[in-house]
Amino acid sequence: MQEQYRPDLIEAEVQKYWQENKTFKAIKDTNKEKYYCLSMLPYPSGRLHMGHVRNYTIGDVVSRYQRMIGKNVLQPMGWDAFGLPAEGAAVKNNTAPAKWTYENIEYMKNQLKVLGFSYDWEREVTTCRPEYYKWEQWFFTELYKKGLVYKKTSVVNWCPNDETVLANEQVHEGCCWRCDTPVEQREIPQWFIKITDYAEQLLGGLDTLPEWPEMVKTMQRNWIGRSEGVEITFKIENSDETVAVYTTRPDTFYGVSYMAVAAGHPLAERAAQNNPDLAKFIQECKNTKVAEAELATMEKKGMATGLNAVHPITGKPVPIWVANFVLMHYGTGAVMAVPAHDQRDFEFATKYDLPINQVIAPVNGEDIDLSKAAFTEHGKLVNSAEFDGLDFDAAFNGIADKLERMGAGKRQVNYRLRDWGVSRQRYWGAPIPMLTLENGDVVPAPLQDLPIVLPEDVVMDGVKSPIKADPDWAKTTYNGRPALKETDTFDTFMESSWYYARYTCPQYHEGMLDSEEANYWLPVDQYIGGIEHATMHLLYFRFFHKLLRDAGLVSTDEPTKKLLCQGMVLADAFYYTSPTNERIWVSPTKVTLERDEKGRIVKALDDEGRELVHAGMTKMSKSKNNGIDPQEMVEKYGADTVRLFMMFASPAEMTLEWQESGVEGAKRFLGRLWNLVFEYNKNPAKTALNPTALSGVQKALRRGVHKTIAKVSDDIGRRQTFNTAIAAIMELMNKLTRASLAGEQDRAIMGEALSAVVRMLYPITPHVCFQLWKELGNEDVIDFAPWVQADEAAMVEEEKLVVVQVNGKVRGKITVPADMAEDDIKQAALADENVQKFLSGLNIVKTIYVPGKLFSFVAK
């Protein structure tokens, strides 16, 4: 055994062993309990970042631990390989997206291997490969046949100069990112999947996921947004037309003073035909892309249409306005406005001098000032005819009943969730498998024509999708008749919605899934990824699982039992201001720091001597140039050190602050462990450990070893507090470093302790532990060694410390045998000199004994 810890000599050799021996190959074995651990698959952007490393290290620790406790573990890895960044990179680097993507995959795969993750690489999935998306295309055609897929026009961002659709992130301040042309809103036909048909299941399923973070479940509940209300039909004055609105507050119905409709509403379009000012306003609204989140804060604007609706109960006219805060794709595209009891309606009514009619009063009878703000709480009805005096529930039901009797309304459950638009007008995605015949009929491509392959050898001009630019690509036949292929491609969330299931049978070519394999491995036991995916990927992934279940491909209701959302990785960020007043961000690796006695940064200089501003700890990002390259850290410190720091520096769900001093500390710790094994191996134990022959000091040390085993087992296995597990191992290591190796039983305890420490650290730092396990004389490799078990007998305390109180104040501490009786403890407490002093001249009136902890005297 070499004297110094040299990760550069160990890690590559161990990784080579794992690769040659296919150590982590997962094979279905019905005699063993399975465990499927999965980290969200990465987009192959070119290089791993520290966020990836954190996510995958957590997954690897869980996988290796579960393997050691005897489970049949599957931990796969793959690539979410379609997506917009590849198109931009292809134009920039004058290459094809496929070539750029495959090169990135090779590079990043090597980076993952260097970090020592225990993946079964034979199950690798790359979502841009035709053999993968063939089955996605097939499944889409099956959903179409079931009536779960439809096509309708939808609003998109359109660049009139490039004549192309832009993703939201390609719109910068209302203009095209490429040519700076103002972006228009256009309606084009798009494909949708009916996720709304599953809204109730998606909502109810959250109650069956006790091991998901509450925050994620709350975010999904809010996103699905179930509400109970009434859909009310208003007639249009002097017309046969009607307009429907949905409200969750029918109790306020007598307070309606106007109606607001979206710019795209048919009533708005009709009114604009003879009103140029209104037509201009509508066009402005349509060209202003408004995210739902911005609605609350933006300036409310509107214009009267000149049309009136008729209040179904009172018969009074209700003016109809076009308003910029009503979105056509939410609800009916029309809202009834009650300014007295809705703040947004109030602001609009105040601005345009519309009536504000109070119909709800506080239950406590207090007056409200409707000149300042709306009263939005529930209360009792006023100015509401026969419903006056009713509370919210009674009024809801009473008014809903009346509207239903009149044929002017119906109770309805609504969802905020909208159907999933899966069309993208981009090139680098899976082609949507639909065909248009000469007569205009649209049909799904038959299985024998799948996959519809995306051509990979293309030239990107940065403007038009190559498959849209090439009319020949779309030409095909259907049952001998000419047809055209769809030139839109799938939203890339499609691929990441079912990859977890394909990992169970990636080489299966007879269908989308081999149900036998899928039902053995699924559901995923542990899923790991960022909370930013809560309402997109994690919702689509749950939805897709239910679609797979209903197609008979999987048997469970949910895709994963347990979810862990790891925190972000932060690093110090530094900048200086250029002569043109621009912030120039400087990489922390190029900064020299001065710190005060508390370790706070007081001065920062770049390598040219410029004084920098410290912007604090922020999320590692390209924009702030504060990312740390994992590869550089692995080359400098070794993979095990990087992994150890990642797991120790912070609880898994919390943000992690990258500190290179902490990485250096992790390296020193592994060096100490190596050194301890080296010293022990100079004179290892030659006789077996004899627990009955140990001294008090030896028993105490061994007790510490087994208490640490118990704590680490609980911290890793149940609590998933990996940082506290490592802290406990470090504390034990401090004791072992000071322990004697003089006697044979001392060395036997040390041998047992080192064997335990190496096994406990193996999931976290597998390379060094692989080597140390061999150095400790074990024949088998550690990869198949069982997890270390705590010896209950060794943890029993022989003595206990009892605190002695007199009249509620601590007056002594006594050490007594662990099995000492209460009366004997009382006598031992009375024998303590300090206790005697405080009891002197007093009569004991009461004693209280908390077994093994406290003996208290009450005396007067």
Curated annotation (Swiss-Prot):
The keyword GTP-binding does not apply. A motif ('HIGH' region) lies at residues 42-52. Disulfide bonds: none annotated. Its main location: cytoplasm. ATP binds at K622. It is found in: Cytoplasm. Gene3D superfamilies: 2.20.28.290, 3.10.20.590, HUPs, Isoleucyl-tRNA Synthetase, Domain 1. Signal peptide: none annotated. Its EC number is 6.1.1.4. HAMAP family: Leu_tRNA_synth_B. This is Leucine--tRNA ligase. It comes from Actinobacillus succinogenes (strain ATCC 55618 / DSM 22257 / CCUG 43843 / 130Z).
